[in-house]
Amino acid sequence: MLTRRPRDEVALIPSDIQDGEAARGPSTFWISNGDNTFIGNTAAGSDGLGFWYDTDETVSGSSLSLSRYRNVSPMFSRFGEFRDNRVHSSDMAFSTCTLDSGPAGYLPPERAQFHNLTVFAGGQGAVWPCEGNQIFTELKVTDTGNLHHAGFVAPRPVTVRNSLFVANSKLSDGDTGTRRSAIGIYDFGVDLRDVHFVNFNNEYGGSYMFGARDADVRITNNPASGITLADTYLYYDRRNDPEDMRPSAWGAVIHDEDGSLGLGAGTALVADHPMMTDSTCTDVFGEGRLCDNRYVRVKMDFDGRKDLPPVRHFRSDGREAIGRPLAARAHYQSVVSVNHNRYHYAYEFDANVLAVGSLVTSMEFAHNDDTVVLEFRNMPSNATVRTSGYSMATNIDALKQGPGRQFVRDGGSIFVKLKANGETWGATDKVSLVW
């Protein structure tokens, strides 16, 4: 028997099983346009998702034949309303991600507000908002996710406020509990306000508030405030041994704005990794430390070259690590602490990379006037800084004590002191070296 493919204008939206980490089908509520209203619904028992904003750049199905949708882009459509909904007994709860497209998905022109979503008794993951411009208020996630598929993962900046995460509740009575992670630190940039964490402890083998993940762009502006805890003392899961972590994973950081994590205002929760910790840090919280530092991202670009070899990361206090970039990425990245002279950071590159003849280095996700000293080792003898506003310091000590935006050559190394300019969490600086 032969079958004929239906015409596009009458075809149904695909509804077979689609497997992905950030989104999977089928979905109980399969939402192809953001301009819809969902109030007081319950989704249960899906092998895929409870609610999936699976938006394409252009309309599909029977909408193709309707002239009023001809210029509509569902992916960028205005947001309708979403409140007082529940998901239980589903493999995933909620996603605004496009299947197999990385951190991409529904991006409304105005901030989408998801209010009072409750998720319980779920599978390996719960909530994935892939793009920014979204806020979750009174989000409740319990008995959902596992150690490596966290209850909440966001590749782009979103806000979570007045919310609750419970690792294993009374629903787990009878030895049905499991190791869990509340929030996976992906590219991130998530603003956490007044969030309560319950039972992230050693029960059932250990559950963690935060879990480190690799990221194409390690966003370090992850502020948290008003954090409260109940039976919780495992803050951080590295997911790997320090020697097996890439720079984007060891740089997964949460900034504690008000001290509610325990060390003080303006401190940070970081991986227990030699490139992140120092004498300001506390004892271990799981596999993390609280440190009296603020951290920014340093990005190093060799004229867009991809397939970069590993680079050696150093600190002047004797610590070092080998940084393996993500495959086919056109930059190195490193997360560094700012505004001190206890040590500086250094990088040693492969000779084949240096053959490119230029290096552009930027500091990102900083505060205004943040400074950091970087050393580039084994540089060609004719290497110099070609950036307007940078001046040459007399020596290394003068550079470190100076106001920033200076450089100096010392032997085979070039030292630079960057100084960020801009708004809080969005300040930047950039310096170009050529040879």
What are these regions (language model features)?
Residues 1-31, 48-84, 91-109, 147-149, ...:
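Acidic/polar low-complexity surface segments
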